[in-house]
From Swiss-Prot:
Any one Gene Ontology cellular component term annotated for this protein: plasma membrane
Name the UniProt record assigns to this protein: UDP-N-acetylglucosamine--N-acetylmuramyl-(pentapeptide) pyrophosphoryl-undecaprenol N-acetylglucosamine transferase 1
Organism: Bacillus thuringiensis (strain Al Hakam)
Keywords, in A-Z order: Cell cycle, Cell division, Cell membrane, Cell shape, Cell wall biogenesis/degradation, Glycosyltransferase, Membrane, Peptidoglycan synthesis, Transferase
Keyword Membrane set for record: yes
SUPFAM superfamilies: UDP-Glycosyltransferase/glycogen phosphorylase
Name of the encoding gene: murG1
Pathway the protein takes part in: Cell wall biogenesis; peptidoglycan biosynthesis
Catalytic activity: di-trans,octa-cis-undecaprenyl diphospho-N-acetyl-alpha-D-muramoyl-L-alanyl-D-glutamyl-meso-2,6-diaminopimeloyl-D-alanyl-D-alanine + UDP-N-acetyl-alpha-D-glucosamine = di-trans,octa-cis-undecaprenyl diphospho-[N-acetyl-alpha-D-glucosaminyl-(1->4)]-N-acetyl-alpha-D-muramoyl-L-alanyl-D-glutamyl-meso-2,6-diaminopimeloyl-D-alanyl-D-alanine + UDP + H(+)
Amino acid sequence: MNKKILFTGGGTAGHVMINMVLIPKFMGKGWGVEYIGSQNGIEKLLVQNVKYNSISTGKLRRYWDWENFKDPFKIIKGCIQSYKLMKRIKPDVIFSAGGFVSVPVVIGAWMNKVPVIIREPDSTLGLANKIALPFTTKLCTTFPQTGENVSNEKKVYVGPIVREEIERGNVLRGRSYCKFQQDKPVLLIMGGSQGAQWINDMVRGSLETLLLNFNIVHMCGKGKVDSSIGMEGYIQFEYIGEELPHILNMASVVVSRAGSTAIFELLFLKKPMLLIPLTNSSSRGDQVLNAEYFSRQGYAEVILQDRVSTNTFIHAVNKLNTNKERYIQNMNGYTKTNDEGIHQLIDIINEVVK
């Protein structure tokens, strides 16, 4: 009888991406594959070609909201739904990429004695994975320092896993897609899957100066394109889909938030990056720690948005471009490969099932 694996994870594109890498690998080996996600999350849009099961879930907020009173009941309902799904599907293993939707799934699996592997993308454990940790068999980390208080028997440092297609990007296709008229270095601006209004405003306030030295590709986020701007050498997108590998490969330098998925993709592509992490006031601080780690390794420049003016932003971008060869040299010293991480994770899953 074929083995079965259930994937879960959602809330952001980063929590879904690793599942999108692994799902075809297991389908290709003849495993039965299904997914458990939320009813309206981004994972429902991204997951294709496998059976998708929706459950009720609450958001694990760190701030005051009236919804906090309802969410425990949603999570309990999600645990019951997950428990019943485990009884029906009878999976051999659960792989969780994190996010609030994963908590009921992990608990439902534990109640059915199904082994669970969770993956933490950031340098510190997210709240969902902290809650899930006692119910899991293995914790796979992206950063070597993650989970310092977790036993070595449970914790495994796997390293980053990114979309394989990003390494197949073509610079000429990227240039053709953007249709830039002048041969200048390309500055790519990425604000994360939801966009970043602060970054958008800073870039638009700096355009006149930045366009003297760069062609600019600006990924703004849904509904955040400013159609009133028509400056030569500046192109805006809400989101870039299948052309993204070509845009990434075309870029000379990148301004980005500091989500784990994005910055490791840039590391694999050896793209000098200026990181502007989400602040501690608007997140749990994981992006600040991710950015600090990359800065210590010499992979990135980091600026904090509450300490930046238009002039300091422009200076930081120009400094990054001037010193880009130094950053590339530092990134060449990173020895982990994407294939290595994928194969190690598959081996861990196979070992747990045995």
